[in-house]
Design a protein with these regions (language model features):
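Conserved P-loop NTPase motor module
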Residues: 1-21, 120-181
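Conserved P-loop NTPase motor cores
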Residues: 1-115, 151
Length: 181
């Protein structure tokens, strides 16, 4: 609890120093599980500063979170992230169907983009295993794409605990060989 904000600030400060020194080189910082950082007012202020500054130095900031609510519920970062994000990537948002009007307004989505987002994974081909994802580029282009991964890629990135346990049990039976499992 104490080390998380300290470690995060050290990493982000190192990025900001590099960002300022490396001229003409594209820089990127990706903040995974951003909800943890956004939950802290000090960290949220830091992310706001980062978003307002990074583009001036040929850089990009990306926040990844499972809930749109994490971003829109933070008054500190909400406007800076949304106003400085030319690219929006959204997965299935059906669980927000009842409050999608406010999400649409906040993200500045057109009715076409709203329809695209709410169509995600609604009519997937039954014979194929894929998930759909929405991309919007600067509000001028948007589309829904299918992403299909190999079984190996799926098991590498799945967060389903039961699937991971099954995979590790099979690997144990095969002498610890995850590739064979």
């Amino acid at each position: 609890k104490i080390l998380f904000p300290i470690t995060t600030i050290i990493i982000m400060e190192a990025f900001i120093n590099k960002m300022r020194k490396l001229k003409g080189i594209r820089k990127l910082i990706l903040i995974e599980e951003a909800w943890k950082a956004i939950a802290s007012a000090n960290m949220a202020d830091y992310i706001k500063y980062l978003y307002k500054t990074v583009r001036k130095y040929f850089g990009e900031a990306i926040v990844v979170t499972q809930e749109v609510e994490d971003i829109i519920s933070s008054p500190i970062v909400k406007e800076s992230i949304i106003n400085n994000s030319d690219c929006k990537i959204l997965l299935d948002q059906r669980k927000y169907l009842n409050k999608f009007d406010s999400i649409q307004n906040l993200l500045g989505l057109t009715d076409k983009e709203r329809s695209q987002i709410l169509s995600i994974n609604m009519a997937n081909h039954p014979g194929r295993k894929y998930k759909e994802v929405f991309f919007s580029l600067g509000g001028t282009q948007s589309a829904v794409y299918a992403t299909e991964v190999s079984l190996e890629e799926y098991y590498t990135f799945t967060t389903e605990e039961s699937e991971k346990m099954e995979l590790f049990a099979l690997a144990d039976k095969l002498g610890g060989n995850l590739e064979l499992a």
